[in-house]
Amino acid sequence: MAKYTIVMVRHGESEWNQKNLFCGWYDANLSPKGVDEAAAAGKALANANFKFDIAHTSVLTRAQKTLERHYGGLTGLNKAETAEKYGEDQVHTPKAVFSRSFDVPPPPMEPDHKYYDVIVNDARYKDGPPKDQFPMFESLKLTIERTLPYWNDTIIPQLKEGKKILIAAHGNSLRGIVKHLDQLTDAAIMELNLPTGIPFVYELDENFKPVVSMKFLGDEETVKKAMEAVAAQGKKK
């Protein structure tokens, strides 16, 4: 029997999503489509009669307006062009070494990278690690290691207090929570493509185990097409 309910949503399409670029910790804004997706997400939540006490998000604009993995040296690169250069199996397939490998990080973001100074000196990260310890990349495994303590130490206690919670975050951060809740294998989570701007619901029992998993607030065909669009981002043109 479900005791707790929590709603999550991946941020709406960003300008860099629209350009098919690896975004990571770069503060890309929402695209016009992303703005529409955020509005549609709000409408879907209202139509489902959801009301929230607390909303959790990341420091980045695209999540605030609707937690992202750090794509290191891939930041700003076109996903399809990267697939062309390194091979599709390195970028976005079940055996992907870069964007969809569970424990192998992408190449590091070196100091001479185009976006290094923009990200490392971003005031949003002022409470983060010092520059000499600033992460230069993240694998999905490292992303989960960064986000799960927040789930366990902050969100779980709030659920126990009876708070109604919405998480508006990033694809990889949310995949980490989904992997944890549904006990997915490394291979299974690599196959999961979370659509932008479509809220999904988890109903949890008293032990925070799913009674209902990833119930999207959208019609099945729309969700399917949105997932396919995400999956296609790493395909060679």
Question: In which residue ranges do the predicted regions lie?
Answer:
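Active-site-proximal alpha-helix that buttresses catalytic centers in soluble enzyme cores
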Residues: 2-68, 80, 84-87, 135-147, ...
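Active-site-adjacent alpha-helix immediately C-terminal to a catalytic or transition-state-stabilizing loop
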Residues: 64, 134, 138-141, 145-210
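Phosphate-handling substructures
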Residues: 68-146, 193, 215
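Short coil/turn segments at secondary-structure boundaries
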Residues: 20-21, 180, 215-216
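Pan-eukaryotic secretory-pathway lumenal catalytic ectodomains of glycan-active enzymes
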Residues: 206-237
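Short amphipathic alpha-helical segments with coiled-coil-like heptad repeat character
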Residues: 42-43, 88-94, 151-153, 210-212
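Glycine-rich, phosphate-binding/catalytic loops in enzymes
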Residues: 24-26, 77, 182-186
